[in-house]
A protein has these predicted regions:
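N-terminal capping segments
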Residues: 1-64, 143, 147-163
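...with weaker cross-activation on analogous glycine-rich loops/strands in unrelated enzymes
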Residues: 4-7, 56, 64-125
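Glycine-rich catalytic cores of cysteine/serine-nucleophile enzymes that process amide/ester linkages
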Residues: 25-47, 94-135
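Short alpha-helical interface elements
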Residues: 37-42, 79-84, 140
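Glycine- and charge-enriched low-complexity intrinsically disordered segments
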Residues: 125-152
Length: 163
C-alpha cells in the first residue's frame, strides 16, 4: 500500500457513511446485510449492537475473513497485533457493558483517535475516541502495512454512544 492509498476495507467502509438504524418496527437492509456478510444471518433487526458486523462485513467484502463473531473483543486475537495505531488498522475499545471496534483513520489535535465505525450513535460515521479506552490494535494477517504510518490530524465529533 502506498502513502496515498487508503486500505481497501476503509474505502469499502466509506461507501456506507449514509447507513443508519431505522427507529421502530422496520430495520435497515444494509445493517441486516452486514450480519449476513459475516455468516450471522439469524440476526434480523438493527437494534442488536452491530459495530462488529460492520467491521467484519467491510473485511469480508474485500476478501479478508473476519472473526465472523458478534463480539468486538473477538478482534483482540485476530490478525496481527500492533503496538501503535496506523491508518486503516482495527481498534478495539473497552466500554461499559462490553466493547467497541472500528477502523482508525486519523487523530485529532488532542491525539484522540478518529474512528470510522458502525453503530456509533446508531449510524456509520467518524467519531473521536480517547486512547485511554483502547484495548488493542490489529492488522489483517498477510496484508502490507501502509508505507506512511502517521495518523493524519483531522477533526470529528466525540463518540457518545456505541450500543
Amino acid at each position: 500500500m502506498s502513502q496515498t492509498t487508503e486500505a481497501r476495507w476503509v474505502t469499502e467502509a466509506r461507501k456506507n457513511l449514509h447507513v443508519r438504524e431505522i427507529k421502530g418496527p422496520q430495520h435497515c437492509a444494509e445493517i441486516l446485510q452486514y450480519w449476513r456478510d459475516i455468516k450471522r444471518s439469524g440476526i434480523k433487526d438493527d437494534e442488536t449492537p452491530w459495530y462488529t458486523a460492520f467491521v467484519g462485513a467491510m473485511l469480508e467484502r474485500v476478501g479478508i475473513q473476519s472473526t465472523r463473531f458478534e463480539s468486538a473483543r473477538s478482534y483482540l486475537t485476530w490478525g496481527t497485533e500492533l503496538r501503535e495505531p496506523v491508518p486503516g488498522c482495527i481498534v478495539v475499545f473497552a466500554r461499559d457493558g462490553g466493547g467497541h471496534v472500528g477502523f482508525v483513520i486519523g487523530q485529532n489535535e488532542n491525539r484522540d483517535l478518529l474512528v470510522l465505525g458502525g453503530n456509533q450513535s446508531d449510524a456509520v460515521n467518524v467519531r473521536s475516541f480517547p486512547r485511554t479506552r483502547v484495548t488493542g490494535y490489529r492488522w489483517p494477517a498477510g496484508e502490507a502495512l501502509p508505507g506512511d504510518a502517521r495518523l493524519a490530524v483531522q477533526s470529528a465529533q466525540k463518540s457518545t454512544s456505541e450500543a
